[in-house]
């Protein structure tokens, strides 16, 4: 338990940011999982839509400071590569 008021505030701010980051990362993982399921079903149009949603979610995570831009670029590249492999 912090004794100094500023330290107590930092604990609270950290807790709030952690919750926010966890929520954003969880939503990101869900969108990526939905894209992977669409790939397994070999539905080309659905997979394209899910890929667009996944890339949008990744970009939003970068904007909010949850992911580093290079990490996001790597994730987008891998997802796009998997989509292109399916479509030929």
Curated annotation (Swiss-Prot):
Purpose: Binds directly to 16S ribosomal RNA.
Superkingdom as given in the UniProt entry: Bacteria
GO molecular function annotation: small ribosomal subunit rRNA binding; structural constituent of ribosome
Gene Ontology biological-process annotations: translation
Pfam families (UniProt xref): Ribosomal_S20p
Basic residues composition-biased segments: 71-88
Keywords, ordered alphabetically: Ribonucleoprotein, Ribosomal protein, RNA-binding, rRNA-binding
Protein name according to UniProt: Small ribosomal subunit protein bS20
NCBIfam families assigned: S20
GO cellular component, one term: small ribosomal subunit
PANTHER family according to UniProt: 30S RIBOSOMAL PROTEIN S20 (PTHR33398), SMALL RIBOSOMAL SUBUNIT PROTEIN BS20C (PTHR33398:SF1)
SUPFAM superfamilies: Ribosomal protein S20
Region feature Disordered, mapped onto this chain: 69-88
Membrane-traversing stretches: none
Family the entry assigns: Belongs to the bacterial ribosomal protein bS20 family.
């Amino acid at each position: 338990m912090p004794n100094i008021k500023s330290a107590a505030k930092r604990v609270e701010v950290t807790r709030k940011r952690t919750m926010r980051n966890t929520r954003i990362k969880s939503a990101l993982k869900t969108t990526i999982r939905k894209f992977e399921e669409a790939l397994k079903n070999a539905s080309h149009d659905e997979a394209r839509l899910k890929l667009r949603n996944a890339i949008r979610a990744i970009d939003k995570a970068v904007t909010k400071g949850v992911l580093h831009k290079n990490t996001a670029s790597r994730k987008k590249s891998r997802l796009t590569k998997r989509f292109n492999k399916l479509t030929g």
